[in-house]
Design a protein with these regions (language model features):
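Intrinsic-disorder/low-complexity, polar/charged segments enriched in Ser/Thr/Lys/Arg/Asp/Glu/Gln
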Residues: 1-7, 15, 50, 63, ...
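Beta-strand/loop substructures that line and gate deep hydrophobic ligand-binding cavities in soluble
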Residues: 80-132, 149
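Hydrophobic/aromatic beta-strand elements that line small-molecule binding cavities or substrate pockets
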Residues: 6-8, 39, 64-70, 81, ...
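Amphipathic alpha-helical segments that line or abut small-molecule/effector binding pockets
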Residues: 15-18, 131, 135
Length: 151
């Protein structure tokens, strides 16, 4: 399993940042590893909504269907994608502050089957992938990365 967690402080109000993050169609705007994202089930974000997210992969792009499995409006949600080869669990939490909010993005990626043997390599690559996504998120939220102890 590979895990990446980041904390981004933003001047945006918490409800605005949450709405932006909860609409998974925005992933392609800030995550350079995502080429397309479309909602396939539900009417807007919320528990049970599903999104097809196309990610860069070798040898060809991979479409992952993310379902929102946990939802606490304006606070936190979890989106899960599962296939025969992997499981991705992304939890986004938004905490308000006087000067905006902190967005915490916690991503876990688990390879399945024979691909699980590549877990050590995945851990190394996932850090670099996460750093690029964090840079895009900082730009999208007009924010800055903050240490884990200061969300």
């Amino acid at each position: 399993m590979a895990r990446y967690t980041t904390h981004v402080r933003s001047p945006r109000p918490a409800d605005e940042a949450f709405a932006y993050m909860a609409d998974l169609t925005n992933f392609a705007e800030w995550d350079p590893g995502v080429t397309d994202a479309r909602q396939t089930e539900g009417d807007g974000p919320g528990e049970g909504a599903a999104f097809d997210v196309t990610v860069k992969a070798v040898p060809r792009p991979l479409v992952l269907t993310y379902r929102i499995t946990a939802w606490e409006p304006d606070r936190t949600f979890t989106a899960v994608a599962e296939s025969s080869t992997l499981r991705s669990v992304d939890t986004i939490t938004v905490a308000p502050h006087d000067d905006g909010c902190t967005v915490t993005y916690d991503a876990e990626l688990t390879l399945r089957g024979v691909l699980a043997l590549a877990d050590p390599v995945l851990r190394l690559a996932f850090g670099r992938i996460g750093d690029r996504a964090t840079a895009g998120l900082v730009e999208a939220l007009d924010g800055a990365v903050v240490p884990a102890e200061a969300p």
